[in-house]
Structures are given as structure tokens and as C-alpha cells.
Amino acid sequence: MAGYLRVVRSLCRASGSRPAWAPAALTAPTSQEQTRRHYADKRIKVAKPVVEMDGDEMTRIIWQFIKEKLILPHVDIQLKYFDLGLPNRDQTDDQVTIDSALATQKYSVAVKCATITPDEARVEEFKLKKMWKSPNGTIRNILGGTVFREPIICKNIPRLVPGWTKPITIGRHAHGDQYKATDFVADRAGTFKMVFTPKDGSGVKEWEVYNFPAGGVGMGMYNTDESISGFAHSCFQYAIQKKWPLYMSTKNTILKAYDGRFKDIFQEIFDKHYKTDFDKNKIWYEHRLIDDMVAQVLKSSGGFVWACKNYDGDVQSDILAQGFGSLGLMTSVLVCPDGKTIEAEAAHGTVTRHYREHQKGRPTSTNPIASIFAWTRGLEHRGKLDGNQDLIRFAQTLEKVCVETVESGAMTKDLAGCIHGLSNVKLNEHFLNTTDFLDTIKSNLDRALGRQ
């Protein structure tokens, strides 16, 4: 723990006069600080701010390098900084997480470093006041929206499903259903009923679910028209942004009322708000049964958005991540129903195992690509909102450089293991350590930008 604090405080000191655990939003470096850092005179000017949410452990260290070496030398941007590192969340009673989400509502774009969600062991390690909730969950509850996960394709990284030559983006409706259900064990014979009592005082509705002859289990779950509608809007807007077709999967043949409501709301919103834009972009929307959809996904080459209910999205997103090769090559973007507000982050965690090695002074080979893409996806969206083509081009160039660097043979250990097997790879023969890989990306980016 002490080592962790020393590292993150030294990082904060290195980035200027910013206090290590300030709960308020902090801006990007002053012009005087930028001069000291020898930033280029002709950086891309960005008119409006981006919210930056710092994180924990190994990803925090990598995040700092990305910002200082890959982003700020080329982009003149005001960053509204929030330290979501676990010590600061504890110090501010998690108010910093709430503040960061409210700032995202105000400025429309946020980039987020991976953060620790504490369990009992973390409470003890960090001597926390309490077991704070997942910051992602807190942010999602304030912003609403849908989390879209998309793989980063590198041609030389083998895929468990070789036919997936284009990305498949999965949108999970992270609200209700089994995750907010009430379940119970029936320990004897009896009748299980559902009751709905209208607020307007009209008649109570009652359904007999099952008459248990002996013990068993039961469950009641729900969702709301408002949440389903927000999910639908996010999915349609994301598909238009990507210019990819959208598929929505349910089991409405079995859950005729429950899943049927998802199907009907999606269709109504599509017909009323999005059909014209879909036709203009030559893409389409289609509802499919979940079992048929799973089969079609495995046979497809990719290149579409898949809208899933909560449980389906939980399961299928992990299948997609593994099928495409690595969680280190998976982006995650929270898209709000307004189509304007997003929060981009890596799909993986804080890479604790590598951080423990780093604390001992040992080099690691930690994959930074998903964290880099969190920055690029946020900056690209800022560019689209502001009509800043230079910023869009920069973000796309950095993404292209990351992919081309891996495809040229320079990569981290996790990716080399996908090709050769983890037990067979050797440092500097098959993979680079973290710093050398990031330096390689920096050199390649500088070269690519010099050509433009």
C-alpha cells in the first residue's frame, strides 16, 4: 500500500503542481508548464474540454505515460481532471466519482482509466472507511446509457473464431432483469403468485406462477419502458455512428410479454426515429431470436452491432472478448441515450498482478492498447461534436499506429502468447516490456504524424 501511494504521488508531482488526491476537477497544465515539457508549437487546438478520470495500479502508471507522451504533445486540450484512484475515492467518500459523472454530463466526453472495485481484501489493504461501490456502476447510474464493447483487430493475433475478420460490437442493457430480481427458495409445498397493485387505485392483478408440490425455487424480475427505450436509442445511434447494421436478440417466443416488450419498443423507436438514417447509410435493423443470433454470429465475418438483454450481454461479451483473442484488445464505451454523451475506457481491469511486480522494481510487459483506445475514442467523439477534423484524424492515426505496431511484430507478452504460447515467448525476441512498447508506439506515432 505504501509503495502504491509513493508511485501515484510521484506521478502526480511529475505532472505539475497538482495535488495527489484532489477531489475537485483540475485543468490541464498551464502554458508555462507546457513550455517546460517542450510540447510542439503546432498542437491541435481543441475548443471544449474532456473529462479525465484517473484510476489505479498498473493502468494508472500507463495512463500517465499515454497522456504525457502520446496525447498532450500533439493535442492542446483542457482536461477536467478527477482522481478516481481508490485512496481518493475513500478520502472524498466517493464524492469524486459522482462529481466526475456530473462533469461528463456537462462536457459530453470523458476518458476513464481502469479502477479498483474494492472487496474485503481491498478494504483491509487500503484501510478504507467502507466497501465503496463500483465507480463504473455509480457513473452508469448517473449517466444512464449502454456499454458497448468492441474488439481491436490485429491481423497477426490469432482468433479462436478465425472467420471474425471485422469487429463485432456488443451493447449490453445493464439494467434490471436477473440482476435486480427477487429470488427465493421454497422449502415446502405452496403456491407462488405475482401481484401487481396499480398506483391509481384500480384493481389488483394477480398471477399464479406455480403450485409447488414440494420444495423448489422461484424468481420475480422486471424492467421499465423508460430503460428499454434509452437502451434502444443508444443502440440505434451507435449503429449510425459506426455505419454498421444492428441486430437485437431476445427469446420472445417463450417470454411473449417480457421479451415481446423489448422487441416492440425497439421496433416502434426504429420506425419513428431512425429508419430514414439507417436507409441513408445503407444499414439495417433486425430482431432475431437469441439462439438463432448466436449461430449467425459464429458464422459471420463481423461488422455489426449486437444489442443484448442484460444476462445475454454479460455472457456473450466475454465470449466475444475471448473469441477475438484478448481482453487487452477490447474497448468499452458508455453511450448515453442523447447520442452526444460518452465515456470511453478499457474493458480490462487495473492489472494488479503486473502492478505487484512493478512495486518490486521488476519490469512488466503490460498491454496499453485498450487504454490508448480509451483516449482515442474520447478524442474522436470530441472532434465529431466540435467539427474538429484534425482531432478526428489524430485519434484515428494513433489507433492505426497501435495496430500497425503490433502487426509489425512489436507487442506485449499477452499478445505474443496468443501467437507462440505463453510458455514459449522470450523478452526482446517475441515481446517488449511495457516502457519499450510504449516508446515504440510513440516513435511510430511521431513518424506517422510527420508524414501528414
Swiss-Prot record:
PROSITE patterns: IDH_IMDH (PS00470)
Record site: Critical for catalysis: 179, 251
Cofactor requirement: Mg(2+); Mn(2+)
Positions that bind NADP(+): 115-117, 122, 299, 349-354, 367
EC number: 1.1.1.42
The family this protein is said to belong to: Belongs to the isocitrate and isopropylmalate dehydrogenases family.
PANTHER family membership: ISOCITRATE DEHYDROGENASE [NADP], MITOCHONDRIAL, NADP-SPECIFIC ISOCITRATE DEHYDROGENASE
Protein's name in the database: Isocitrate dehydrogenase [NADP], mitochondrial
Organism, scientific name: Macaca fascicularis
Binding site for Mn(2+): 291, 314
GO terms classed as biological process: 2-oxoglutarate metabolic process; glyoxylate cycle; isocitrate metabolic process; NADP metabolic process; tricarboxylic acid cycle
Chain positions recorded as substrate binding sites: 117, 134-140, 149, 172
Predominant subcellular localization, coarse grouping: mitochondrion
